C-alpha cells in the first residue's frame, strides 16, 4: 500500500467554501467534558485547568516543576491542542492541593489558570472523558459562504460526518504512520515504549482513514449510478453482490451505506453486533441509535464479515494482527456533532461555530467537511 497521504473523500458534495481559520487561542477553544462527576472526597485532588500555547504534556511538566509532583502521579483524560485555548481536568495526590493556591502567580506566568478544585477517589486515566465542546471562529467569510456553511451544517446535523483521525495523529511531517510500520517491520525502535505504541497506533489510524475514504467512495458510487452500472463496478473490484442487495442499498436514506457484514455498535456507547438486516440497521443509523465501525487492526481485533470483510481486507496488515502488544479494536466510521450553534457576524466577516463531539473525534474532521479545500490533504491546517 502507498503510505503517502492521499486526499480523503468528503461526505457531502458542495463546492469548496473559502474562509480563513487560524488555530489559535482566540479562534479555537476546547472544553473537556468529564466522564463522571467528581465526588468531592478521596485521595486525589482534581483540578480544572485552562491553558493556552501549551500541549498537555508541556502543562504536566510545568506542574511537576512548580509543585514537585512526579509526572507519573499526574492523571489526565486526553491530549488537548497546543494552538488553542483549552480546559481539561487533571488529578494529583491530595497532599499537593495546598500548594496550588500558593503558586497561582507562577502558573499564570506559564499561561495556566486553575479554574476549580475538587476531590475524587481515583486517579484520572486516559479515556476518562465523555467528549469535548468546541468553539471555532472562521474569518474572511462572505455572506454567501456563510449561507453555504449553514447548509452544510444542516446536513451534518441530520446525517453526521466521517469520523476521520485528525492531522495531530500523524505528526508535523505526516510520517508517524510510516515510522509505526518500520517498528512493526523491526527496521527501527525507540527506547520509550509509549512512543513505539503511539507510532504503531498512527499506522492503524492511517489504515482506518483510508478504509473510511474507500467506503465513502463505494457509497457515492452506489447512490450515483444505476444497478446495472454498480454491478459492473463491483465485478471489476472482484466483489460479489446481487442486484436485489444493490437496490436495497440505493434505497438507504443515509449517504453512508450499511453493507452486509458490517460491524455495528450502539451509539455513542454500547456493544458491537453484526448488521444482519440492512434496512433495519440503516434506519437505526439514520436515527443515530447505532453506527457502523471500521477496523483498527490488531491481535484481538473484531473483523467484519461477507461483503464488508472483502473491502476491509485491503486495509488489514499481518504485522498488526500478529503483534503481541497491538490488540486492535474498532472505531465508529461515523460521528454525530451535537449542540451545534452558529452565528454570522456580517460587519466583521466572521462565522462563529460551537459544537460537541464524543471522545476520540476531531474538530478537524468537521472543518474538513465544511471547507472542502481543493487538493486537500490531511495536513491542511
UniProtKB/Swiss-Prot annotation:
A Pfam family of the record is TruD
Q: Name one GO cellular component term.
A: cytosol
Q: Which GO terms describe its molecular function?
A: RNA binding; tRNA pseudouridine(13) synthase activity
**Could you tell me the keywords of this UniProt record?**
Isomerase, tRNA processing
Outline the extent of the TRUD domain. Answer: 160-335
Q: Which reactions are catalysed by this chain?
A: uridine(13) in tRNA = pseudouridine(13) in tRNA
The UniProt entry's GO biological process terms, in alphabetical order, are: tRNA pseudouridine synthesis
Catalytic residues per the record?
81
Q: What is its EC number?
A: 5.4.99.27
Q: What class of enzyme is it?
A: isomerase
InterPro entries named in the record: PsdUridine_synth_cat_dom_sf, PsdUridine_synth_TruD, PsdUridine_synth_TruD_CS, PsdUridine_synth_TruD_insert, TruD_catalytic, TruD_pseudoU_synthase
* Residue stretches in coiled coil: none
**Function recorded in the entry:** Responsible for synthesis of pseudouridine from uracil-13 in transfer RNAs.
User: What NCBIfam families does the database record attribute to this sequence?
Assistant: PRK00984.1-3, tRNA_TruD_broad
Q: Which family is this protein grouped under?
A: Belongs to the pseudouridine synthase TruD family.
Tell me the protein's name: tRNA pseudouridine synthase D
Which gene does this sequence derive from? truD
Amino acid at each position: 500500500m502507498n503510505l503517502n497521504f492521499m486526499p480523503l473523500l468528503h461526505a457531502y458534495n458542495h463546492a469548496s467554501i473559502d474562509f480563513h481559520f487560524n488555530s489559535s487561542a482566540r479562534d479555537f477553544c476546547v472544553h473537556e467534558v468529564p466522564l463522571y462527576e467528581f465526588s468531592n472526597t478521596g485521595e486525589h485532588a482534581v483540578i480544572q485547568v485552562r491553558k493556552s500555547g501549551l500541549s498537555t504534556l508541556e502543562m504536566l511538566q510545568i506542574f511537576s516543576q512548580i509543585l514537585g509532583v512526579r509526572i507519573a502521579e499526574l492523571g489526565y483524560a486526553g491530549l488537548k491542542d497546543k494552538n488553542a485555548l483549552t480546559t481539561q481536568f487533571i488529578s494529583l495526590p491530595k497532599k499537593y492541593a495546598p500548594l496550588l493556591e500558593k503558586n497561582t502567580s507562577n502558573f499564570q506566568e506559564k499561561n495556566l489558570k486553575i479554574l476549580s478544585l475538587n476531590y475524587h477517589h481515583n486517579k484520572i486515566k486516559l479515556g476518562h472523558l465523555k467528549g469535548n465542546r468546541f468553539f471555532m471562529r472562521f474569518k474572511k467569510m462572505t455572506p454567501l459562504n456563510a449561507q453555504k456553511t449553514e447548509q452544510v451544517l444542516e446536513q451534518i446535523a441530520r446525517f453526521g460526518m466521517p469520523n476521520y483521525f485528525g492531522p495531530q495523529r500523524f505528526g508535523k511531517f505526516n510520517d508517524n504512520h510510516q515510522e509505526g510500520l518500520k517498528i512493526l517491520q523491526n527496521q527501527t525502535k525507540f527506547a520509550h515504549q509509549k512512543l513505539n505504541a503511539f507510532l504503531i497506533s498512527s499506522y492503524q489510524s492511517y489504515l482506518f482513514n483510508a478504509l473510511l475514504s474507500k467506503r465513502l467512495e463505494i457509497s457515492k458510487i452506489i447512490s450515483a449510478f444505476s444497478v446495472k452500472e454498480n454491478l459492473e463496478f463491483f465485478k471489476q473490484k472482484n466483489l460479489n453482490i446481487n442486484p436485489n442487495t444493490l437496490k436495497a442499498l440505493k434505497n438507504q436514506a443515509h449517504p453512508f451505506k450499511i453493507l452486509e457484514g458490517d460491524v455495528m455498535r450502539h451509539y455513542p456507547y454500547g456493544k458491537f453486533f453484526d448488521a444482519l438486516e440492512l434496512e433495519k440497521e440503516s434506519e437505526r443509523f439514520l436515527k443515530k441509535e447505532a453506527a457502523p465501525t471500521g477496523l483498527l487492526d490488531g491481535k484481538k481485533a473484531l473483523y467484519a464479515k461477507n461483503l464488508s470483510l472483502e473491502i476491509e481486507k485491503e486495509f488489514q496488515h499481518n504485522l498488526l494482527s500478529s503483534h503481541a502488544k497491538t490488540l486492535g479494536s474498532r472505531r465508529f466510521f461515523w460521528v454525530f456533532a451535537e449542540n451545534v450553534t452558529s452565528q454570522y457576524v456580517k460587519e466583521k466577516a466572521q462565522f462563529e461555530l460551537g459544537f460537541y463531539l464524543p471522545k476520540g473525534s476531531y474538530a478537524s474532521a468537521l472543518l474538513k467537511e465544511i471547507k472542502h479545500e481543493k487538493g486537500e490533504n490531511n495536513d491542511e491546517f
